[in-house]
Amino acid sequence: MKNEMQGIQEMLGGKLVTGDHDSISLFGAAAQSDLNQISRKITDIVQKRFYNQENMIDEERVRAAIEQFEDSLRAYKSNRWRGFSQKKRQREYDTTLDTIELMSTSLKLRQVELLRETKIFERLIASLKVCEINLTECISTGEMLLQNQPTGKRDAEDIFWYSRLEKRISDLRISRSLAQQFRVEACLLQNSGIIICDQIRNILSNVLPIWRNQASLVIQKEIVSKGFGGGNSTDYQNVHDADESLQYELHRLYRLSEELNDRRKRINQIQNGKEEHP
């Protein structure tokens, strides 16, 4: 059946033939078929993007580990961490680094996927533009034929054919509106993917290194404190200066981490559609 319809379409050349009902059925059908395929591709990308967001990384596990580590930093600053055993601190340090590396790997994979989607959207947007142009040409051709239809006495079959043509043109106008709408949606999805890529790049370049430094500073402070324990006044002053320097650095990085952490939250807001994109 498909080959038969394709043969008829090739025979008619996709053009209107006055009085031929098959030509009306096939008029603009190629552009509508292309539009339908593009729509399916956009839907597939959106569904896949949602699936990746839900399954590429264990968000709850990552967030829980980071929050636990940040709670430990707060506890350390208030001197509540001194009672913890060294092994427990080391385990927490290792767990935090493992979690950070897991997030880093997952975000890199997501970034590659988003870049691939961006290229796909470029092709889809171009194809939608072509569909819109083809549909516009069909509409113009049909409208011209309607304007030049015979006047005076006509048989019922002729009137019915032009009535079908008018309805067909109306359908093509709807398809053209859909092509325009899909193109806008594809542009928005492409832009949202670019925004998310930028946020991921910032997290990989700034946020994750800061979290690693936070963990290292805590362990370094522990090593320095134990290394200078029980020394003379000069040693005490050295450890005091080192302690003050590390605490200042820890406080500075902690505040910066909180600021940059907001950007991580924006990724989830964008993915969940909680933000509007220009």
Model-predicted regions and their roles:
Residues T99-L107, L128, L135, L165, ...:
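Long, non-membrane, amphipathic alpha-helices that form coiled-coils
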Residues E113-R116, I120, S127, N134, ...:
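Residues on one face of amphipathic alpha-helical coiled coils
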Residues P150-P278:
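Long amphipathic all-alpha helical oligomerization modules
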